[in-house]
Regions:
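Class I Rossmann-like S-adenosyl-L-methionine
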Residues: 1-132
Length: 132
């Protein structure tokens, strides 16, 4: 589990997905854990919940989009970068109320801060998300 306290809805969703992948955590338990630790408004709590469950429910579709816009095989993408890309693609392709520039910028910030990615990987993610 990530020990850092999440500050945004997207961080809550990302931390939930990271915990599921890395620790085998159950989605509802991890989500409630991070929602309890975050000091979010009810609207942001709802967004975090929608993003986390939306990515979980649409992982295959998010990966399909990722394959269409990336030349890199999914198996070559670091797990946290992959999760962040799924989160960004979900926001871009499957939600209608999140502005594209916000989805791209916030996803790139998540990758930079929590995926331990170098600038080349950050640039790759930025390019893929802008193409979606």
């Amino acid at each position: 589990m990530i020990k850092k306290r999440p500050h945004t809805a997207r961080e809550v969703a990302a931390f939930t997905l990271f915990s599921m992948e890395e620790d085998g955590a159950w989605s509802d338990g991890a989500l409630h854990h991070y929602l309890d630790r975050a000091d979010l408004a009810p609207r942001d709590r709802a967004l975090a919940t929608r993003l986390a469950y939306g990515v979980i429910q649409n992982r295959l579709l998010c990966d399909w989009y990722l394959r269409q816009f990336s030349k890199v095989r999914l198996s070559k993408i670091a797990p946290r970068v992959h999760i962040c890309l799924q989160l960004g693609i979900y926001q871009l392709a499957l939600t209608d109320r999140i502005p594209a520039h916000a989805a791209v910028a916030e996803t790139v910030t998540l990758i930079r801060n929590y995926a331990h990615a170098n600038e080349r990987t950050v640039g790759f993610a930025n390019g893929v998300l802008r193409a979606v």
